[in-house]
Amino acid sequence: CLSLPGGCELGPRPIDLHLSALGKLGVHIKECHGSMKCTTGDGLKGNNISLAFPSVGATENIMLASVCAEGVTVIHNAAREPEICDLAHFLNKCGAHISGAGESTIIIDGVQYLHGCEYTVMADRIAATTFMSAAAVTGSHITLKDIVPSHLESVLPIFEEAGCSYHLKGDALSITGPKRLQPLK
């Protein structure tokens, strides 16, 4: 049995997309005393799954569940975040057959089994942005190493508009917060 989720500081985190997708793959889910009992009967079977919106968590869970499912799973309206691509690279290195990660349609051709591998997980862009924000609000300087610059392209102009200066060199980003942050338009 799995415990039902409770959400976080930002609010509730509904899992209906996850449960619906898992059901389409052959998972039978019953609620029992505040928990969920999940069974698969004859195993998981590939299917076409269309998400109502591109959820990162639901896309990841579908990828993980269908990688060893029998047949082909196609995820429509899949999340396109870098974390999806990284998970696909990892699973493919373990023997999976996943294509289309980073696009709105992902195709997973189920395999019988996965094997181990050595893999370096990509840099966490959310953690990097958190440290950048800390430097910005305190007027400090920070250098972040081993980042993926393209994953931060959308936030760098915002920091610049707020008065921060930054310098990219390879996979390192140095950012300096201003004495006083500028309002954003």
Feature locations, PLM:
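Structural preference for solvent-exposed beta-strand-turn elements
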Residues: C1-K185
